[in-house]
Amino acid sequence: MFISGRRTADKWRAEERLQCPAGSARAALARCADGGAVGPFKCVFVGEMAAQVGAVRVVRAVAAQEEPDKEGKEKPHAGVSPRGVKRQRRSSSGGSQEKRGRPSQEPPLAPPHRRRRSRQHPGPLPPTNAAPTVPGPVEPLLLPPPPPPSLAPAGPAVAAPLPAPSTSALFTFSPLTVSAAGPKHKGHKERHKHHHHRGPDGDPSSCGTDLKHKDKQENGERTGGVPLIKAPKRETPDENGKTQRADDFVLKKIKKKKKKKHREDMRGRRLKMYNKEVQTVCAGLTRISKEILTQGQINSTSGLNKESFRYLKDEQLCRLNLGMQEYRVPQGVQTPFMTHQEHSIRRNFLKTGTKFSNFIHEEHQSNGGALVLHAYMDELSFLSPMEMERFSEEFLALTFSENEKNAAYYALAIVHGAAAYLPDFLDYFAFNFPNTPVKMEILGKKDIETTTISNFHTQVNRTYCCGTYRAGPMRQISLVGAVDEEVGDYFPEFLDMLEESPFLKMTLPWGTLSSLRLQCRSQSDDGPIMWVRPGEQMIPTADMPKSPFKRRRSMNEIKNLQYLPRTSEPREVLFEDRTRAHADHVGQGFDWQSTAAVGVLKAVQFGEWSDQPRITKDVICFHAEDFTDVVQRLQLDLHEPPVSQCVQWVDEAKLNQMRREGIRYARIQLCDNDIYFIPRNVIHQFKTVSAVCSLAWHIRLKQYHPVVEATQNTESNSNMDCGLTGKRELEVDSQCVRIKTESEEACTEIQLLTTASSSFPPASELNLQQDQKTQPIPVLKVESRLDSDQQHNLQEHSTTSV
């Protein structure tokens, strides 16, 4: 068996020598050594491999002699080299072939299906013990074994293509270029220096030092000193077949990170400056001293900006109270942002001929035809406190002014941003008066739950998001004390804060423009009241809160079994936050009388603040002169409460129809911190756009209720106390003045109250407050807090004359 295997190998080797030239003997020998015998038969060829060393040396000598002839030919350029030059011979030749002939020192040669090895620089081969080199300066060119004589082309030698290996990936090599004497391009050196090399054993680090030595000799640039030793950098092939080094990725990432970080650093440092004309001395930007302002001269050599100087002169004139012509808004003042509608409103001044005409703006709505009066607190900030009071008097006089038909000229008047000094209403009462009882509706239900304002504040805070909250609205509470079924309490500190505004001080139910003379603010039957609305929104059925009360089951079982297709609409419920058209009034029955109303709006924020005030209400107001037509068209029941006076909602289609019939209206959007005034006989409807806490009250103006009528009301109230028996004492409260006297002294005090032109008694008798003594027409309202039996006696003597 052993002999037959050996004969078979000898026979195969003889056939290979006949078919292949001497140049391909080593390839055949390699195939015979590795594939010709398996297992114990492999040792037979070890001795025969040594016999082939001489033939290999002859082949290498012949290749070295043919190289000068090939180099003498015309060489192509680096970028236009033929494809055969790019592919280089395998590393299974030369010294590795000779090493294979010594089995005691080196392992046998790897099979021919391994990767090809690329040699980038055609420098001299490193000296070896077994392979003698041909003397001479000529560098041997490594060529692949030539093909058989029948298939060899006449042109230059081209490497024979090998079958693609099954276990290793293909590599794409850069074109082989011969380095010329002289300096090279930096990119060329980088490409050769960082190229991937492998040794004869497949280890990329085995030939690293030799290649570095070659670079040093070829370039000729680093002849002295220690050569720089750098580890070969790794290359990663991309999907297009191109190679990219790992350091390129790192550099790209660093550049991207630096750019991004630079943007983030510069993002928050931009100063908000709108114009050079609004930069004041306080900002340190104009560099204008006070001496220059007083002299009124500009030095041309100082390089001052004329526009900045003009603005500062105008600003100084604004604060000097110099008169009507000089009192104006500085020409350089520009608001940060305003809508087109607001810009058109501010551009229209109301020519009243007074000192404050530039601060009053009149809007004539083109769609509805009604007039609206506007004032802006950012413009009024230039006014002093005394001038603010005078402006508020003039503004309110225009607001409630009427024509010969007793119809107001303006459908609405707004002071934008006038309530900015007040705290958030809901936060104020939740933290200062947490146990105040309130009535809270369940969202989307008709149930009412009684809770504390602190608990309501917690629910709003938990469900608030982006301007709305998903909890039930809070019904109105009284801020001047609860009567009968009302909810609320008396909050004198909060009322004092309201009176700090000159607009509210005159228009509160006990204000200077009111016809009522209340000795105590808790006696007011006209408010103020406060309520909170969540804003109109669509609520998914899954988010709808469940009622705490049990519902009765429907008696009709067929309705429960009926199938209603959903089509494409989601299952959600519209929560309407609307107050239909109504007219504010006082009195009941024959005493019904329309009156004016005042409101203050504070948006529910919970930490979401913005530069622009948020829109809270969408309001439609009809002109007071069209009061009768609107009542007939909308079928209002004026004797009902405001919530139930009208059964239909007035939308755009209805407004257009009413406008064609000659009815005028105004459509306004009220924002956070706005104070609005509605004259009498103005029918209006509200829609809550976002979560808002509102204050509102009625005011009985003096022009609506003459002094004679107020005096008669005071006489009737005094008549009620005339018939009371029993002893009454004089008590003075911090807020209220209660007049309690003996029955014998009642007639004298009634005469005092009914006679407006009589002299006022000294303060020592009635212990009146100082501000009441200075009033020109003192009218005192007698307050009686009686028991049930005393109230019965009061009704019996109500018809008694004075």
From Swiss-Prot:
Transmembrane domains' residue ranges: none
Cofactor: record remark: Binds 1 Fe(2+) ion per subunit.
Residues where 2-oxoglutarate binds: T579, Y676
UniProt keyword annotations, A-Z: Chromatin regulator, Dioxygenase, Iron, Isopeptide bond, Metal-binding, Nucleus, Oxidoreductase, Phosphoprotein, Ubl conjugation
Domain of life according to the entry: Eukaryota
GO cellular component assignments: nucleus
Basic and acidic residues bias: start-end ranges: 210-221, 232-244
EC annotation from Swiss-Prot or TrEMBL: 1.14.11.-
GO molecular function, one term: histone H4K20 demethylase activity
Chief site of localization: nucleus
Residues binding Fe cation: H582, D584, H684
Enzyme class: oxidoreductase
Protein name: Lysine-specific demethylase 9
Organism: Homo sapiens
